[in-house]
């Protein structure tokens, strides 16, 4: 049970946190305290005189949440708690105009990097990016013939509690905001089936002469994982204009790469209804992968063109003039959209349904610009109903979900269930032996895989966890190879060249 004295101390600590992190200034101290007290239902606030330093946010918020639950201000469930603590943090988060003004001033007077450094820090300090949860994600690297692939088991998205699931089913449908990306999420109170965003701020940027918005992903799968979204709720579309938009962003923020999910189901991302790109300040394995074969395209002698040594099928274009990359990228995209090669099981369309598209990634590398074009095809078959160029069923025990932009570049985002399954698998391998895996209903899905790697690995209590992580990395490599439209063999290489010869 939380006493009034303790809750007053917690409010004071929160205000001191806001001051220390520059979310508020000294002149805002009383205003912010009163705003928090209003949310907490505190009428007789008696703050301690102490100025707290080095305040850790998560324990203070937890204390405030426990009090709110105790007083009936919030329900005791993960969704309700998230809605409530975001409301609290909204009291400390600067107004959008202040954030935008400071970002633009830093951009103008210092550098684009100084501006994004400020904005990224703010996004974490305001708890929009929940650092305490991100820290729980499991992360490791796996060495492969394609370089160092990154693996993360995503634990930062909270599992919905049964009460919240039931309440969401009963909730009235709402068309506001239209989706999780819309600009209207800024300051939104949220509801049982839509996250609160009182602590969310965006930065308007001009892209291709239009208003777009820069924000960070609340789940930060990699360093400074940002999202660039159209201010208008309009569908994803990969075309010449999209390539131009990518480079318009890179020109303004040369320290960031930017890419787009494909615009078709299966090979695209989870949100196809709102045009957006994803970028950040991170070196992916694909970006540093070497060129294994070069090509020449008539009329584009000034552009370096090559196939990237990567499990998926990637063309890299490089030139000091990005307009030339946009022009050639459009030519390749147009050709790929209509390209069929039955011998390689590439069909542009079946029954009028288009299958070919591209996942593009743009970056500045030294004085030159690069455009990576990842060839994609979303055809399905009876044997592969989730997609032929998609991880096949024997890999679904590790990765079944869409292979989007992040995975394409070499970072596996794996489901939270794997944490417990990895621990249970390690325990079974050491204490019961590999044959017991098939007898465990929770681990049976991993049996074929475990038997295969256990046959050639020396597994001990000291190395079992590293072995499992290493083998998951190998599965992810296969996942990417399955998603590649041209296979990594002589036949696939010949088919790749056939396509390039048509450009």
Predicted feature locations:
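Active-site microenvironments that recognize anionic phosphate/pyrophosphate groups
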Residues: 1-228, 232-235, 309-311, 325-329, ...
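Secondary-structure-rich domain cores
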Residues: 209, 218-263
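Catalytic or ion-translocation cores adjacent to nucleophile or general acid/base/metal-coordination motifs
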Residues: 237, 241, 250-273, 279-340
